[in-house]
């Protein structure tokens, strides 16, 4: 029987963080590094918990090289070959602790991932990525991967509700990806009518995960460094970004010149572009749930990284958090009708 949940759910655009008294004298005093010990793998990881999404335009080896210099993380897209991985591992061994191998839930995906992890044993993270993390098949796949790789840290998703976060953690996942439809090039919500506002999803899923000593990634909906800060404030352990890292030198694809403007292609992994590239086209039984856009070329990603990290440090000083770990404890969200002054855009 159809039912309506009348509780209002909120997104990042619906709130601001209230400033609070602080003893910090400078943004430079803020520690953005986190150390986690994961529930099922028992592995420990230290770094700044911002992740480049495993999309084939941004989740590249070139991106991982720069991100690892800042102790940040990259979920490498699943379309690199075994030889590509071997070459990367040989030339950039210092990056391997800050990357994940990505996989879908098919048998071919599992076989390819297994070969990569056997060839590059220094990689300890697995990112199991499907559009709909609610299927029984996916839960069974997570259990299978856990049985085959008992000491690897498994990221799995995507879901947006607490009961499914708990199910995946109890099935062997360590970190749950939270977000259905909020991405900048995702059209799931308009094609299917399915989704969940990201701020509320993160708050609710973090509560469920942390009760089981699990962790979550807020995946999608961030448009600016302030949104990244709100995701951490809402309880996310990691924040995954795609659109904010698009358009850079380190992204896949050539720079396009059109009408004197430099551009780079960025597309969702369920878009026509991605499915034609990797699956020979859109299957007749499904619809494209992503868009393809031309993003203004932004140059090297280093400047964007510094902008995001600088914004996070500033957020922490405004709310009195000396460490990123403290941000969620110091966060009070206020509902708003406007985010900023729009006189000049």
UniProtKB/Swiss-Prot annotation:
UniProt keyword Ribonucleoprotein, yes or no: no
Annotated active site: 186, 188
One cellular component (GO) term of this entry: GMP reductase complex
Residues the record lists as binding K(+): 181, 183, 186, 189
Chain residues that bind GMP: 242-243, 268-270, 286-290
Keyword tRNA processing attached: no
Record-listed NADP(+) binding positions: 26-27, 78, 129-131, 180-181, 269, 285-286, 314-317
Phosphoserine modifications at: 28
GO process annotations (BP): purine nucleobase metabolic process; purine nucleotide metabolic process
Similarity comment text for this entry: Belongs to the IMPDH/GMPR family. GuaC type 1 subfamily.
Subunit structure: Homotetramer.
Designated name of the protein: GMP reductase 1
Species the sequence originates in: Rattus norvegicus (Rat)
Gene: Gmpr
């Amino acid at each position: 029987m159809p039912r309506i949940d009348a509780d209002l759910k909120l997104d990042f655009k619906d709130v601001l963080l209230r400033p609070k008294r602080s003893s910090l004298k400078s943004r430079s005093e803020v520690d953005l590094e986190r150390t986690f010990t994961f529930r099922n793998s028992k592995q420990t990881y230290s770094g700044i918990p911002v992740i480049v999404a495993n999309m084939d335009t941004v989740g590249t080896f070139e991106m991982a090289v720069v991100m690892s210099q800042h102790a940040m993380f990259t979920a490498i897209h699943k379309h690199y070959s075994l030889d590509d991985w071997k070459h990367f591992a040989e030339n950039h061994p210092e990056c391997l602790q800050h990357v994940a191998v990505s996989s879908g839930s098919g048998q071919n995906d599992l076989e390819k991932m297994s070969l990569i992890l056997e060839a590059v044993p220094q990689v300890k993270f697995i990112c199991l990525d499907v559009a709909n993390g609610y299927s029984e098949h996916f839960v069974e796949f997570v259990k299978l991967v856990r049985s085959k790789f008992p000491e690897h840290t498994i990221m799995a998703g995507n879901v947006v509700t607490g009961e499914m976060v708990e199910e995946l953690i109890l099935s062997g996942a360590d970190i749950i990806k939270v977000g259905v439809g909020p991405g900048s090039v995702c059209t799931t919500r308009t094609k299917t009518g399915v989704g969940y506002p990201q701020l509320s999803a993160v708050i609710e899923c973090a509560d469920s995960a942390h009760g089981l000593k699990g962790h979550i990634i807020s995946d999608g909906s961030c448009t600016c460094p302030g949104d990244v800060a709100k995701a951490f404030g809402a309880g996310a352990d990691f924040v995954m970004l795609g659109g904010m890292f698009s358009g850079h030198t380190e992204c896949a694809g050539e720079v396009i010149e059109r009408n004197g403007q430099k551009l780079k292609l960025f597309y969702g992994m369920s878009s026509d572009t991605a499915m034609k590239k990797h699956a020979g086209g859109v299957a007749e039984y499904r619809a494209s749930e992503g868009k393809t856009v031309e993003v203004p070329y932004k140059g090297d990603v280093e400047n964007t990284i510094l902008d995001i990290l600088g914004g996070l440090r500033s957020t922490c000083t405004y709310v009195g958090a000396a460490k990123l770990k403290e941000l969620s404890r110091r966060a009070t969200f206020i509902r708003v009708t406007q985010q900023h002054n729009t006189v000049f855009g």
